[in-house]
Amino acid sequence: LKFKNLQFHALGTDTWYANIGPNHPLYHASEVTMEKLLPHPFVRLPDDYFSNLSFYLEIDGVRLEQFKRVVYVNDSAAILSLLRSTDVVRLGPGLSAPDFAEYGIRTIPIRNCQVQINVGWIQRSREMLSTEAQAFVKMLEELYPKNEK
């Protein structure tokens, strides 16, 4: 980043959780394991140029490619609909928990999840933020208050 005259402003860290709807047998679990999730369909967006999660992501010794039933969708509304009406599982950050909870979807910790997501924003060095950009950064900072991890 320094070479490109960019600065990273850290907001916080997160990890991955299992998003599970009311038709999933593990809906009331306080914690899940990847082994217990494997028999269920996994819903996700397709990998893109910048994210190739299928080949490198591993949680507690289980790689995403080990899911035998994967449902690829092209938008978040389809994910939400499937989570609400079937036994699919989605993996994602805890930040989205309040949004999913509005629709009766639980965000459940995954045992031994070593995934760490560093959340932040990037700014050009020596460049002032516009009023709109400052407001957006403030909104982001409210999602990751300084007094948390």
Feature map (PLM): residue ranges:
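Short secondary-structure boundary segments
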Residues: 1, 22, 49, 92-96, ...
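Short loop/helix-cap segments at secondary-structure boundaries that form the rim of catalytic
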Residues: 1-5, 29, 98-103
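Short beta-strand-centered segments that line the small-molecule binding cleft or hinge
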Residues: 1-16, 20, 58, 106-108
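Alpha-helical segments flanking ligand/cofactor-binding loops in enzyme cores
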Residues: 9, 35, 80-81
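Residues embedded in well-ordered beta-strands
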Residues: 17-19, 25, 43, 89, ...
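Secondary-structure junction motif
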Residues: 26-30, 34, 38-63, 94, ...
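A late-sequence structural motif
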Residues: 28, 106-149
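Hydrophobic hinge/microswitch elements
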Residues: 47-107
